Design a protein with these regions (language model features):
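Acidic, metal/ion-coordinating pockets
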Residues: 2, 11-15, 20-36, 41-448
Length: 448
């Protein structure tokens, strides 16, 4: 008790001693202010600053002696700022992007004829009049350009596709950023056509995938598009090249083409999975005009998911095949086995011998929203918008005497009952549109 009383007494004396200098400075300051008129303005300011500085120093010294941390206030500010930065960073990491993709852009000769102008050039913009507003809503748009562009080769449709260079202007203007060239028609204008087609795409301001024209396949980087802070890897593969690969060297085949070699695909998809936030694969395989995928398709596409693919946009059959969701590690992945045709001259009127002829004029516009949160990217929503190619007689003829048609792709949401363009359709077209819309939704069966 005596020791505690003695300690309290010493602390009080210490506190009195600490207050003494402060009170003394205060008294002197009062005395100064009473007599400040005796000083010049300059001298007054200098002395005032000295007095304030001494007062602040003594106050801080007194607080330090009493055990009050001199930096407590600034530490709190730093801590709050750090917390704010963490919250801001977390918020910045929560981002979403919308990806759209469609199937074959298949330019048959009748489409060229209609696009030909009097001056000998071509204009394909009207093909995408009703598609463009949809594509412009997306952050990344991917199409499958099934053919080549080679000005040193004759124009052609089936079986050797080679389109005028102007197609790329229209495709770019519609909103596409990436075009898949891994398909069975990429050699239709020889190995030179691989390079000229990729070059035409790049000159139009887009990116080709599925061919390698700058570096050999085994040395080329994975194509990754950063969209709103999300890195999207893009890979594409083809089952074959219509036998034309037999007429090119093994070196050209290995260096420039992207086939379904499982060892190579596995390595590339695994690499993409490490380098990007989400991986999109566009394989071309299956049986033409068949509405269901083969067992080979199912097995391989599921392997791709196992290797690291998140989204698989399939193609080749020229008709739409169903979609499927696959759960992996608690997250849903997306497969659509075939997106069908998005623009072509294949239809009921031209494919009368084909059992599924009506399906060749139909396709889907895949509409997928991906979300990145806290470093993890997942598929948030996925939709398959039915599409249909309308072919309307223009009432005019080509110089060779062929009838000309207006080819336009419709996103059927806009043309069914209640759609903004419904009133433009005649009764026969309304029935065709409504049937296509209903059958397509049932067939694709995508419920996310």
């Amino acid at each position: 008790m005596h020791q505690k009383a003695r300690r309290n007494k010493m602390e009080k004396r210490s506190n009195r001693n600490q207050k003494g200098p402060i009170l003394q400075v205060a008294r002197e300051s009062i005395h100064f202010f009473k007599n400040y008129r005796q000083w010049s303005n300059k001298t007054f300011i200098v002395v005032l600053l000295i007095v304030v500085a001494i007062s602040m120093a003594l106050t801080l010294l007194a607080q330090g002696i009493k055990g009050i941390p001199l930096t407590s206030s600034s530490t709190t500010v730093v801590s709050q700022t750090a917390d704010s930065k963490e919250k801001t960073t977390a918020t910045e990491q929560e981002t979403s992007a919308r990806i759209m993709a469609n199937g074959d852009l298949l330019y048959h000769i009748p489409i060229y004829r209609t696009a030909l102008k009097e001056d000998g050039t071509y204009d394909f913009h009207e093909n995408f009049e009703y598609v463009k507003p949809w594509l412009k809503q997306a952050d990344l748009v991917i199409g499958d350009f099934e053919g080549t562009v080679n000005k040193d080769h004759y124009l052609g449709g089936y079986p050797l596709f080679n389109a005028p260079g102007e197609v790329m202007d229209a495709i770019k203007d519609a909103g596409y950023q990436v075009l898949d060239l891994a398909h069975n028609h990429i050699l239709d204008s020889q190995i030179e056509g691989v390079f000229s087609t990729a070059d035409a795409i790049e000159k139009a301001g887009m990116t080709p995938i599925g061919v390698y024209t700058h570096e050999p396949r085994d040395k080329a980087p994975i194509v990754i598009k950063e969209v709103k802070g999300i890195k999207v890897a893009l890979l594409a593969y083809s089952y074959g090249f219509n036998g034309i690969e037999e007429y090119i060297s093994k070196e050209d085949y290995d260096n420039h083409l992207s086939d379904l070699n499982e060892e190579k695909m596995k390595a590339e998809i695994e690499r993409a999975e490490k380098e990007a936030d989400i991986t999109v694969v566009m394989p071309q395989m299956g049986i033409e005009y068949q509405l269901e995928p083969t067992e080979e398709q199912k097995q391989l596409y599921h392997k791709m998911i196992d290797w690291g693919a998140d989204i698989i946009f399939g193609g080749h059959p020229h008709v739409v095949e169903p979609a499927e969701t696959v759960e992996k590690d608690g997250d849903k992945k997306l497969i659509i086995y075939s997106m069908g045709n998005f623009l072509s001259n294949q239809r009921i009127e031209t494919m009368q011998d084909e059992e599924n002829a009506k399906w060749t004029e139909r396709g889907v516009l895949m509409d997928v929203t991906i979300k990145k949160k806290a470093g993890k990217t997942t598929i948030e929503t996925a939709k398959a918008h039915p599409s249909w190619v309308n072919r309307t007689p223009k009432g005019t003829y080509s110089p060779e005497g062929y009838p000309l048609y207006l080819y336009q792709t419709y996103i059927l949401d806009d043309f069914i009952e209640g759609g903004k363009y419904r009133s433009q359709l005649d009764e026969a077209t309304k029935e065709r549109v409504d049937t296509a819309y209903t059958e397509m939704n049932e067939h694709v069966g995508l419920k996310w």
